[in-house]
UniProtKB/Swiss-Prot annotation:
Keywords: Ribonucleoprotein, Ribosomal protein, RNA-binding, rRNA-binding. This protein binds specifically to 23S rRNA; its binding is stimulated by other ribosomal proteins, e.g. L4, L17, and L20. It is important during the early stages of 50S assembly. It makes multiple contacts with different domains of the 23S rRNA in the assembled 50S subunit and ribosome. The globular domain of the protein is located near the polypeptide exit tunnel on the outside of the subunit, while an extended beta-hairpin is found that lines the wall of the exit tunnel in the center of the 70S ribosome. This is Large ribosomal subunit protein uL22. GO terms for biological process: translation. Signal peptide: none annotated. It comes from Levilactobacillus brevis (strain ATCC 367 / BCRC 12310 / CIP 105137 / JCM 1170 / LMG 11437 / NCIMB 947 / NCTC 947). InterPro entries: Ribosomal_uL22, Ribosomal_uL22_bac/chlpt-type, Ribosomal_uL22_bac/org-type, Ribosomal_uL22_CS, Ribosomal_uL22_sf. Belongs to the universal ribosomal protein uL22 family.
């Protein structure tokens, strides 16, 4: 007999925010319940907060629709950020020169799973 699935995940790829900045937000919600994590994200004044909230809501929707899990029982079991491809640009400088600018992107993954009993 197949095992019962107790987790669901969502990923946002190539988001135009540096992974270092997203990690500050991700670290706030790891291990929290879904309701608490969404409340934290709503009141966190960082540019990555709405993006992480969107990924979290997507993971919850995946859990509800694909695996029939209850929203109240879900916790953020895993949340991590990886670096995406870097967009390389040039900024004009004095005397006809130019400096390289790295526009960094990130891949955001959030995994929600049911609370452990006990």
């Amino acid at each position: 007999m197949a095992e019962q699935v107790t987790s669901a995940q969502a990923t946002a790829k190539t988001v135009r925010i540096a992974a270092r900045k997203v990690r500050l937000v991700i670290d706030l919600i790891r291990g929290k319940s879904v309701a608490e994590a969404l409340a934290i994200l709503q009141f966190t004044p960082r540019g990555a907060s709405p993006v992480v909230a969107k990924v979290l809501n997507s993971a919850v929707a995946n859990a509800e629709n694909n695996f029939d899990l209850d929203r109240q029982d879900l916790v953020v079991s895993e949340a991590y950020v990886n670096e995406g491809p870097t967009l390389k640009r040039f900024r004009p400088r004095a005397k006809g020169s130019a400096s390289p600018i790295n526009k960094r992107t990130s891949h955001i993954t959030v995994v929600v799973s049911e609370k452990e009993e006990g």
